[in-house]
Structure formats: structure tokens, C-alpha cells
Amino acid sequence: DPKDRKKIQFSXPAPPSQLDPRQLEMIRRRRPTPAMLFRLXEHSSPEEEASPHQRAAGEGHHLKSKRPNPCAYTPPSLKAVQRIAESHLQSISNLGENQASEEEDELGELRELGYPREEEEEEEEDDEEEEEEEDSQ
């Protein structure tokens, strides 16, 4: 009795009565069991996938499921993410260097033309502060 209690009872729909008992047995044999599905989910070698026994046993359906689903999102690998991050950081540092050199070029040109650009900016800031103080009174 203790052994009988450990057996798992699966509820299955009653088969149509018009089928022959031999056909029912063949259908039952073709149906994958949970253990079979678990085994198929594991990565199997290509030799196993091509074996004729597997197709004869009705397990060939899993080969279709091995194809990637075009709608499913596959996240990038860790190496791909690292490459993306490195290229992003590189582009940021390149932008920073280019902007700094462009600003230096502009300042040099302005100084050559006699414009003390930095002093003008400070004066503009002072004017804005004075206007804000007048507005608040």
C-alpha cells in the first residue's frame, strides 16, 4: 500500500470510444511524458537530434521549438553589453576632447580679434544679477 500512495495520478480526458484499442495504445506511446520533455529541454548533441529513433518515437516536434521565436526578446550577452559600454565611453571621451579643442580654437580666434570673451561673460552675469535684484524690489 505505501508504494501505491507514492504513484502520481494524472487525469486524462476519456478517449473517444470509436477508436480501436491498438490505435489508442499508439497515441499513448506518441504522447511525450514529462520526463521526456525535460530530457528534450536539455541541450542535446547534434548527433542525437538527427537520430532516426527520435523521430520514430514521435519526439521530432521538439526540433521546431529549437528555432528562435522571432517575436521573443533575447537580451544581449554580457560581452556584447561590455562592448557597447566601452564604445559609448570612448565616444563620450572623444566628444569631450573635440569640444574642448574647438572651444580653445574659438577663444584663440577671439583673442586674436581683440575680444576678451571671458570678461564679457562675467559682465553679462553681473548685469543679469542686478536686473533680478531690481525685479524683486
Swiss-Prot record:
Signal peptide: none annotated. Keywords: Cytoplasm, Phosphoprotein, Protein phosphatase inhibitor. The modification Phosphothreonine is found at T33, T74. Phosphorylation of Thr-33 is required for activity. The keyword Phosphoprotein applies. Pfam families: DARPP-32 (PF05395). The modification Phosphoserine is found at S44, S45, S101, S136. Residues 1-137 are annotated as: Disordered. GO terms for molecular function: protein phosphatase inhibitor activity. Residues 88-99 have a biased composition (Polar residues). InterPro entries: PPP1R1A/B/C. Residues 118-137 have a biased composition (Acidic residues). It comes from the Eukaryota. Residues 40-62, 108-117 have a biased composition (Basic and acidic residues). It is found in: Cytoplasm. GO terms for cellular component: cytoplasm. GO terms for biological process: intracellular signal transduction. Inhibitor of protein-phosphatase 1. Belongs to the protein phosphatase inhibitor 1 family. PANTHER family: PROTEIN PHOSPHATASE 1 REGULATORY SUBUNIT 1B, PROTEIN PHOSPHATASE INHIBITOR AND DOPAMINE- AND CAMP-REGULATED NEURONAL PHOSPHOPROTEIN. This is Protein phosphatase 1 regulatory subunit 1B. It comes from Sus scrofa (Pig).
